């Protein structure tokens, strides 16, 4: 009886092109970025009242929202994607860290800070999976961060009792 050679199983090629979900997430990031910029424009009269920590938070979030569509829509695995990915990780990480300096009116952390903690735990895994070329896990973490750290957290910045919501809807 013949035996088969013991070769490791061939790695299945992963299609790295943006799929429907990534195109949708990138589009939603653009929509959210538009709402943030519109709120900022409408609240220009109050800009002088904002502490630096809020400006840092807004700047890093705007950078993250702006980079998201570019990264999700562009070809993957090249230097540009890698460089923009590191910039995205840095901006999102700084946003998450900075969020702990932003408190409720009573000085407490809010439930949304749980997303900041999850984000800070997920970012190292995102970088590690990219460096290991583990495309499936990397893609899963990216989607989770875009949905949770960007879109969900961003959505909850627009209720009327929050600054951006007040500026946009008043």
Predicted regions mapped to residue ranges:
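Alpha-helical membrane insertion/targeting regions
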Residues: 2-170
């Amino acid at each position: 009886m013949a035996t088969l050679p013991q070769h490791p199983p061939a790695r299945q090629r992963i299609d790295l092109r943006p799929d429907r979900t990534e195109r949708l997430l990138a589009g939603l990031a653009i929509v959210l970025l538009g709402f943030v910029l519109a709120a900022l424009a409408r609240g220009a009269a109050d800009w002088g009242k904002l502490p630096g920590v809020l400006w840092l938070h807004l700047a890093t979030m705007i950078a993250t929202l702006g980079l998201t569509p570019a990264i999700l829509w562009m070809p993957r695995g090249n230097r540009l994607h890698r460089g923009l990915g590191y910039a995205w990780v840095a901006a999102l990480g700084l946003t998450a860290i900075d969020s702990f300096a932003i408190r409720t009116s009573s000085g407490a952390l809010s439930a949304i800070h749980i997303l900041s903690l999850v984000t800070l735990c997920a970012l190292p895994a995102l970088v590690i999976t990219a460096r290991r070329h583990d495309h499936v896990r990397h893609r899963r973490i990216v989607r989770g961060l875009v949905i949770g750290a960007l879109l969900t957290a961003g959505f909850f910045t627009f209720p009327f009792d929050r600054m951006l919501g007040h500026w946009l809807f008043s």
